[in-house]
């Protein structure tokens, strides 16, 4: 058995993909795929950070119409994972040279992701997580720019 006690400097879980109708389908974007951005056709301007949910957390930084998803962070019940979220957000902001104009978080005031959002010092936009799921599905399958403007 090979073992070492080296400190993990940058966490990176495995990416999980499957195939649907012979096309690759991303289940969890992480090592090798994050922070590769995805683009939208909508003409959005500005910088925003969405801190994600409490369970199976990832976050995303939007810069105009480019969106940079984080690697999988994990469940925020564990304070070590909360610290990893804070460190990864800081690293992304440095890497992308971003200072968000707002941070989006869950409506639930006791979620650790909400606490992290509030501690960042940016204006906070709270979104009910079921509504966030609807927007995500709308973006994936419908015309998101129309849905998001309402």
Enumerate the language-model features and the residues they cover.
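Short beta-strand scaffold segments in enzyme catalytic cores
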Residues: 15-17, 57-62
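Two-metal-ion RNase H-like nuclease active-site motif
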Residues: 45-52, 143
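Gly-rich Lys/Arg/Thr-decorated short loops/hinges at beta-loop-alpha junctions or inter-strand turns
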Residues: 62-76
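Phosphate/pyrophosphate-binding loops at sites that engage ATP/ADP/AMP, CoA/4′-phosphopantetheine
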Residues: 89-100
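Short glycine-rich phosphate-binding loop at a beta-alpha junction
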Residues: 98-108
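Short Gly/Thr/Asp-enriched flexible loops that form oxyanion-binding sites at enzyme active sites
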Residues: 110-121
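Conserved small/polar residues in nucleotide/adenosyl-binding loops
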Residues: 140-150
């Amino acid at each position: 058995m090979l073992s070492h006690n080296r400190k993990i400097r940058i966490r990176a879980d495995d990416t999980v993909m499957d195939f649907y109708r012979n096309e690759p389908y991303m289940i969890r974007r992480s090592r090798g795929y994050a922070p590769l951005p995805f683009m939208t056709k909508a003409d959005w301007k500005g910088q925003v950070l969405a801190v994600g949910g409490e369970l199976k957390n990832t976050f995303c930084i939007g810069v105009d119409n480019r969106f940079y998803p984080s690697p999988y962070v994990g469940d925020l019940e564990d304070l070590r994972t909360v610290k990893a979220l804070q460190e990864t957000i800081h690293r992304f902001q440095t890497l992308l040279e971003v200072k968000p104009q707002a941070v989006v978080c869950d409506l639930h005031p006791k979620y650790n992701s909400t606490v992290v959002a509030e501690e960042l010092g940016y204006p906070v936009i709270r979104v009910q997580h079921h509504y966030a799921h609807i927007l995500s599905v709308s973006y994936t399958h419908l015309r998101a720019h129309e849905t998001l403007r309402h």
